[in-house]
């Protein structure tokens, strides 16, 4: 936290001494930049972003600039820190006459503040931003957060009802701290359905190793005896689907970001749909149509706004379970059920049941 504070504070001091000579872009054709970590064709998180911005390009005729972060450490620049490498990649995108610049993922939280103050002529959007605490979101920037715990709760409930084992698996990548809303929402859903079930959490060393994901999933299914695995591990997580398909139709997976049942039709029991592309499309199209950007705020989206939802396929779940999930959805939307997004909130949730 101290490191993050110093990083942002120094950025603000630099900006305070810097008078930008760049003029606001005055062009009929809107230019939108997108910077992400990993492939835009990951069948999940970045794919949702890609689909949204491509739809934006096709419908409005914008110029679209997309870039993935270079793999770190960068060949020939091994002395660069991770933050410096990300900044270089962002500057590369900003060589274009951008109107809007979307930064995809929590890792850009600090950088988005720095860039916003350096380039007041560009509007920025950060997806899945960290909690900025007392730091004010710049007027030309917009932070978007999602109530991931709400859909994770429903996924946990479904997993508990469908599992043939007494353990449920949860697989993340190396940076799992920012996924606590998913974890404790999922855990709460399991507990709500069956307090006797146990959550087995594992952390993969990389987000880009599909074979490692498969090996870890095989171990979780066969040795840990989990009945369902919920992977949030990028490309690594796709290995879970391969493991489940190899073991057979009784080994279940929960998809994320898109309906991923097509990857393993006999194994995927539900998917959390987190339509990031829909949010980007909505905000960007408002700017394109009206040249209005409502910055300086944090936007929160969940079940109520229709941005996050859970797949309820009656051919996979029985009709009774579908009805139960719909009932739980309504209770979450109405506020009757407050889904926990942290360990403390989870303990409080348990104590009230």
Curated annotation (Swiss-Prot):
Q: Which InterPro entries match?
A: BMP_lipoprotein (IPR050957), Peripla_BP_I (IPR028082), PnrA-like (IPR003760)
Q: Where is the lipid attached (N-palmitoyl cysteine)?
A: 17
Localization annotation: Cell inner membrane
Q: Which UniProt keywords apply?
A: Cell inner membrane, Cell membrane, Lipoprotein, Membrane, Palmitate, Signal, Transport
Instruction: Describe the task this protein carries out.
Output: May be part of an ABC-type nucleoside uptake system involved in the purine salvage pathway.
Quaternary state and partners of this protein?
Answer: Monomer.
Q: What is this protein called?
A: Basic membrane protein C
